[in-house]
Amino acid sequence: MSVRLATPRTLVRPAGEADATALWQFRMENRQHLAPWEPLREERYYTQGHCAQTIADWRESIRLDRGYPFLVLDPGEREVIGTFNLANVVRGVFQACHLGYAVAQRWQGQGLMREALESGLDWAFGPLGLHRVMANYMPRNERSGKLLERLGFEREGYAKRYLCIAGVWEDLIAGLQR
């Protein structure tokens, strides 16, 4: 799949084999920053070999139309600013997916993920042909809630003990896009 979405300050595209080191650097530099918002990770998650396998798995997910993981890069493609995934794609009468995302600590608060996600959502509702994109966030993750709100997501409900994040079953606010 050769999707390249350029925004004024980012380039959004699927990861290729050559991106394993950049993904590893992103994971290592943001390990503590992202830990409160992610599942518990085994130590091997933070190896270059695991990053290479992750990219291979992502590419297979795209091939099977099950998910569309993207890197958010600086325009020169030197650094991973963040990642997002249009995951758990369901076709047929539903035409929907779940959105997940992460942004590097040093890039947060600059509107870069909003820019990248606007581009990705336009692609999801356009060429990908989705009707619904769902996103959930933990109530204490106010930054995530504000980002989703700016992207036009509307609160749909409150799911108690919905996902195991950082070893704890967390409540999530459920939302949808358009």
Indicate where each model-derived feature is located:
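Conserved GNAT-fold acetyl-CoA-binding loop/helix
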Residues: H33-A56
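Acyl-donor (CoA/ACP) binding surface of acyl/acetyltransferases
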Residues: M1-A22, F26-P36, P69-R178
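A short helix-loop-beta-strand connector motif used in the catalytic cores of GNAT acetyltransferases and
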Residues: E43-R44, A56-L71
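A generic alpha-helix structural signal
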Residues: W24-R27, I55, R59
